[in-house]
Amino acid sequence: GDVYKRQFVYFPGAFYGVGYNAGKEGYAQDLTTTMGAFRISYCTSLVGRFYIGVSGGIDYSGAKYKNSGMADRMNGIQADVESGKPVPGGKMGELYNLWQEGRYDPAKQDPFSNYIATTGDKPNAFNANVGLFAQYDTRDVTFNASKGIFIKAEAKWYPEWLGNTRRTFGRFTLTFDFYQKLWKGAVLACDLYADATTGTPSWHMYAKMGGMERMRGYYEGRYRDKKLVETQIELRQKIYRRHGIVGWIGGGQVWGTEKFRWGNTLCSFGCGYRFEFKNRMNIRLDYGWGNFGNQNLPWDRKRSSAFLFTASEAF
C-alpha cells in the first residue's frame, strides 16, 4: 500500500564532526537546526509476506551556528600570562592549563565550522532521492511484536540532477529483527541494522549512531560516518497487568572516512519501564548508557547517557 510521511522540526543540536575519532574526542559545536522531510512509498505483496516497493523523498536541513573563538581567547590569555597577569579562574583557566599540557586543542572547538571550510559543504542542504526496497514480515504485531521476524533492505539514490546539494551519492540500509517468546510474559527481541553510503553525502545525511531506537544512551550524531552497523538484544518482561520492564545490551561501529577497527566498537546498555495504555501499545521510558567521553575535557568526562520517553518500542 501507500505510505506518506512528513516532518518539520526546529531544535538546538550539536555537531561533533565525521568519523569515530571526531566523536571520541568530544569537541562539539552548537547548532540551531531546521529540518524538513517528506517521504512517500508504495509496496505490493510479491509472494505471501514478501513485499517489494518503490520510494521517494525530500530532506532539507539548515544550520545556524557561531564560532567560539577559543583559539583567539587562549592566545589572549597566554599573552596576559606572559605579561605577568595570573591565569584566570573558572572554565577558561582550566582549559588554558589543559591547552598548555597538550590535553586540549582550541582549534578543534568548532567542528562544524571546520567541516564546512574543509569540505565546501553548505550549512543549508537539500537532498532528494528515489529508491527501491524489499521486505519480509512475519511479526504478529507491527509495533510490539512477540514473535516473528522482520527483514528490510532498501537502496536509495540521490542524483545531482534532482537538485542535491552535494554530488550524486547512494545509500543502502538493512534491518533484521527477530522476536521470540520465552516464558510467561517474556519476549526476547534482537535487532541488527546496517547503513552504508557511497559517494559524498551532505553533512546531515551520514549514518548516525544513537537516538531513540538504537545505541540508546548516545547523542544521535555524535558518531557519524559513511558506514555504520549496530546490534542489540532486549529482554521484555511483563510483571503485572499493564506494567512491564526491559533490559538491553548492544554494540555498534562507524567507519568509512576512517578504517574499521574492532577496538572502536561502542557499547550500549540500559533498562526501562513499559505501560500498556492500549492493547499491545506501550508507553516507553528508557534510560541508556554508553561509553565514557574524553577525560581531558571538563564537559565530557562522564559516561554517555540518555533518558528516553515515547509511545512505541525501540524496534
PLM-predicted stretches and their roles:
Residues 114, 120, 130-133, 139-239, ...:
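C-terminal outer-membrane beta-barrel translocator/porin domains of Gram-negative envelope proteins
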Residues 32-38, 124-130, 147, 166-172, ...:
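Residues that define the transmembrane beta-barrel architecture of outer-membrane proteins
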Residues 41-47, 135-139, 177-182, 236-238, ...:
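Structural signature of outer-membrane beta-barrel channels/translocons
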Residues 6-13, 64-72, 145-147, 163-169, ...:
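Outer-membrane beta-barrel translocator domains and adjoining extracellular loop/strand segments
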Residues 48-52, 141-143, 183-188, 241-245, ...:
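Repeated loop/turn-to-beta-strand initiation elements of outer-membrane beta-barrel proteins
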Residues 212, 273-276, 280-281, 285, ...:
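Outer-membrane beta-barrel "beta-signal"
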Residues 55-59, 68, 135, 152-156, ...:
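Transmembrane beta-strands of outer-membrane beta-barrel proteins
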Residues 1-4:
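Short, small-residue-biased leader/transition segments that mark boundaries at the very start
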